[in-house]
């Protein structure tokens, strides 16, 4: 509770990056490559991570302007729709 209060007092908040339902989960969806390192500044719409499913590559974008705080999934790790890949802190 205190963390939430501190977050709102400073004006920043944490925003998750979630694997969307792409209809490709049956093809073995996995993180292929992180395009942005932890602690890096991003703008909403910047490509931050590449997912791969079979021969299909999908880039996911930063949901907000801010900073990538933590990557929660390693490269080559399998993922599924709804899984949180990373957290961003708003600027």
Each predicted region: which residue ranges?
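Short, conserved catalytic or interaction motifs in soluble domains
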Residues: 24, 36, 53, 73, ...
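Short hydrophobic beta/alpha edge segments that flank linear recognition/processing sites
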Residues: 42-61, 80-91
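Acidic, low-complexity mobile loops and tails
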Residues: 1-47, 59, 65
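Short, compositionally biased
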Residues: 57-70, 75
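Short flexible/disordered coil segments
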Residues: 37, 74-84
């Amino acid at each position: 509770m205190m963390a939430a209060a501190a977050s709102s007092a400073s004006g920043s908040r944490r925003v998750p990056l979630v694997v969307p339902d792409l209809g490709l989960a049956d093809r073995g969806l996995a993180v292929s490559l992180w395009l942005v390192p932890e602690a890096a500044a991003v703008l909403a719409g910047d490509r931050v991570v590449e997912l791969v499913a079979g021969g299909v590559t999908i880039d996911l974008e930063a949901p907000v302007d801010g900073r990538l705080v933590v990557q929660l999934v390693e490269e080559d790790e399998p993922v599924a729709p709804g899984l949180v890949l990373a957290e961003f802190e708003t600027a």
